[in-house]
């Protein structure tokens, strides 16, 4: 073979190799670099999350004034600055605003290709607020007491809380995805529980569709997160229904599609104990076994265990995919837990509960 031909082949081969290397390098840069700054910032924020020792110190506050003062060296300081009367309601609102600020920060600092997911996560608070307001209205309770100041449609939610009639709420919801389900509720075509399920079904469908539209690591992480949340919702719905002696046909409309576990066999068991036994063979078996005895007396124990399982799973994914969307998801879950615990401490202090008992109760609430 002539020297020129050999040189040509070598040049072509080198060009192909360098093109491939360049492509792979560009893919790595595109995939990981956008997470470098936000994840470093989130890790720094994670280091500031309150320790168990700090929660115990807060439990010793005895007054809400002291509780607020004790948080002045934390990221809650600016949100608590508006507290003047030191009521538990004021403090809860401030903590809710702090949590909302965390969601908003994620939307701001994360790559554009994933930050819409965090906007969608805020819609869960819309669903919670809408259902809470309507439940309160139906039993003639002050609906504004149940509004959490987080979500994408807070002004509408507050208007709903102030509405004089149930029909007025329909006008407020006009043009939103919630208009049609609410109209069915007003007409008596669906029950309040079915209305709530429909809103969650719509919410999780949005999340899952978004997750499935992603590729590679982002799809793996987002899909796992959404399906875990759906599983948690379905398991708790099913067990509460079994505790209430509901039949399979009554429960089916309350199940949200998109979870990882098959529920058909569990739907047809006779009671809560048998349902727990059926769940033992699923991926959640170990979680349930750890709290089995307590669960039969108090289902909130399982809710906390499932929340903990989801947090642990996101932490695992954070270690496996350090420069990924797993880090902000893990942080959001930890922040939600922190705010729940702070709200619980504030409420217990307001109720005059002794510090040692507060520590026990808040530790259980983790």
UniProtKB/Swiss-Prot annotation:
How does the protein's chain sit in the membrane according to the entry? Peripheral membrane protein
The answer to whether the entry has keyword Transmembrane is: no
Q: Which Gene3D superfamilies match?
A: ATP synthase (C/AC39) subunit, domain 3, V-type ATP synthase subunit C domain
A Gene Ontology cellular component where this protein is annotated is: plasma membrane
What SUPFAM superfamilies is this protein classified in?
V-type ATP synthase subunit C
The Gene Ontology terms for molecular function here are:
ATP binding; proton-transporting ATP synthase activity, rotational mechanism; proton-transporting ATPase activity, rotational mechanism
One example of a Gene Ontology biological process annotation:
proton motive force-driven plasma membrane ATP synthesis
What are the record keywords, sorted? Answer: ATP synthesis, Cell membrane, Hydrogen ion transport, Ion transport, Membrane, Transport
What subcellular locations does the record give?
Cell membrane
Under the subunit heading, UniProt states: Has multiple subunits with at least A(3), B(3), C, D, E, F, H, I and proteolipid K(x).
Free-text function comment from the UniProt entry: Component of the A-type ATP synthase that produces ATP from ADP in the presence of a proton gradient across the membrane.
NCBIfam families recorded: AhaC, PRK01198.1-5
Q: Which family does it belong to?
A: Belongs to the V-ATPase V0D/AC39 subunit family.
Q: This chain belongs to which protein, by name?
A: A-type ATP synthase subunit C
Which organism's genome codes for this protein? Thermococcus onnurineus (strain NA1)
Q: Which gene encodes it?
A: atpC
